[in-house]
From Swiss-Prot:
GO molecular function, one term: aspartic-type endopeptidase activity
UniProt organism field: Sus scrofa (Pig)
Pfam assignment, any one: A1_Propeptide
Propeptide: 1-43
Underlying gene: PGB
BP GO annotations: digestion; proteolysis
Protein name from the UniProt record: Pepsin B
Family label: Belongs to the peptidase A1 family.
GO CC annotation terms, alphabetical: extracellular region
Main localization, broad class: secreted
Top EC class, one word: hydrolase
Catalytic reactions of this protein: Degradation of gelatin, little activity on hemoglobin. Specificity on B chain of insulin more restricted than that of pepsin A. Does not cleave 1-Phe-|-Val-2, 4-Gln-|-His-5 or 23-Gly-|-Phe-24
Keyword Protease: yes
Enzyme Commission code(s) on record: 3.4.23.2
InterPro entries: Aspartic_peptidase_N (IPR012848), Peptidase_aspartic_dom_sf (IPR021109)
Length: 67
């Protein structure tokens, strides 16, 4: 197991905010009912969709082989 140092990059949200297009983008997104994924009175599994991708941006450097 090898540990990789992660660095946080500028998120898509930050980049869109700088360009002044974030508010328009978010207004055009469909509204989703967060409770719709739960089936009440049912023993089904509730799935949590990964949709908050605007705030996530991490990268790490990986090198393979010898220089």
């Amino acid at each position: 197991m090898e540990r990789i140092i992660l660095r946080k990059g500028k998120s898509i949200r930050e980049a869109m905010e700088e360009q002044g297009v974030l508010e328009k983008f978010l207004k055009n997104r469909p509204k989703i009912d967060p409770a719709a994924k739960y089936h009440f009175n049912n023993d089904a599994v509730a799935y949590e969709p990964f949709t908050n991708y605007l705030d996530s941006f991490y990268f790490g450097e990986i090198s393979i082989g010898t220089p």
